[in-house]
Amino acid sequence: MDKKKAPGQTVASSNWLQLQSTLSTITKEKDVSNSKAHNSRSSQSPSSSLRSSSRIQRKSKHSQGVGQYMGRVEVASTAKTTVSQLRKGKVISNEPCILLEAFSDSPLLHELRHMVLGNHLLSESQKEPGQYLAIDCEMVGVGPNGMENTLARVSIVNYHGAVILDTFVQPREPVTDYRTWISGVKQSDLLGAPQFDEVNKQVANLLHDKILIGHAIDNDLKVLMLTHPGPLTRDTQKYKPLQEIAKNKRPGLKKLSELLLGVQIQTGAHSSVVDARVAMALYRLHKKEWERSVWRQTEAYRSISSVNKPEHVLGKRGHDEKEAEDGEETAGESKRKNRKKSGNGGGRQQFPGGGRKGISSGLDVIVRRNGQRVDENGRGDGTSRRKAGRGEISTFTGGESWWEQPAA
């Protein structure tokens, strides 16, 4: 006889009972796998556990990005680059960038990759400003919603990547957006930083008459409130061969660094030191062709600007960057050498009075009367002088001079 269910009692359906049994089986299997995993982790050696903890620490430190670098002593107006020996294999860098596989075994590429990381040894002479400087700035937001840019940090490196200037700048307006996630600048970094006018003057003095390299350099000059002569500016974003490689009319610095240097940058907050070094590295890779394409404009500008320079400044080209090591002699330098050789070895002998031997430096004045040439005595067309030279007539005939005669 069928059992009748009591009033108010609910009986589970067959489908629900089957689902419950399946769920209980899955739960038991998970418990068994979790217990096995726990036992395997507990059986690991202390050294492996230490390695895993160190990996976690490194990951957390790396995630802080440029903040680690920004808090160091090097970030100041008297900053010095960190130098170390070139190493093989994995490179440990204090900057937020990653060394990828090299595309070639070129010594120049090898040097430039380590220059970007600051992992290279420099001599004292290579730490001087020199004739080539690369610049990059970090900006924070001011105004409503932080939409306007203002200078917060400026970094300048030389031809070899040595830091010439790296300093925070105290904004002249209240900051409404520090953009720390991309600029790496925190509010505490700007406390006690140099005033804008002081940094502006310092940068202007450094950049005077230098070849200036940068990426989208107009943005940096704008926040610095400076200008730089076009013939002395090298913008890696506007250089056509780099645009063609990146297949973009406005290539990003990060993409160019990966394509040409094999260095991944801007993995977190940006570092203006790293970005300036990358711009310099890209310029040095193409320096020979780049300078050949603009040497006429550069030399024309220098020749014009040299007119207003004091005599003791003329011909001063700054510290030797040792471009010969890279085979980077420019077309302008080659032309100057050829002109110098032809000037010294052309067989022309110079004299104190100017001009060349056997050639008069004055002008002959020819006087004519009624369309006829007149000799030194004011007579005729000069035939009497020629005849006198042959002994045919006397050189002085006397009589009235032509200017004393009445007009016809």
From Swiss-Prot:
Exoribonuclease involved in ribosome biosynthesis. Involved in the processing of ITS1, the internal transcribed spacer localized between the 18S and 5.8S rRNAs. This is RNA exonuclease 4. GO terms for cellular component: nucleus. InterPro entries: Exonuclease_RNaseT/DNA_pol3, REX4_DEDDh_dom, REXO1/3/4-like, RNaseH-like_sf, RNaseH_sf. Belongs to the REXO4 family. Residues 27-70, 310-408 are annotated as: Disordered. It is found in: Nucleus. The keyword Isomerase does not apply. Its EC number is 3.1.-.-. Its main location: nucleus. GO terms for molecular function: 3'-5' exonuclease activity; exonuclease activity; nucleic acid binding. GO terms for biological process: RNA processing; rRNA processing. Residues 40-55 have a biased composition (Low complexity). Residues 131-292 form the Exonuclease domain. Residues 310-322, 372-384 have a biased composition (Basic and acidic residues). Gene3D superfamilies: Ribonuclease H-like superfamily/Ribonuclease H. Residues 343-357 have a biased composition (Gly residues). Pfam families: RNase_T. Keywords: Exonuclease, Hydrolase, Nuclease, Nucleus, rRNA processing.
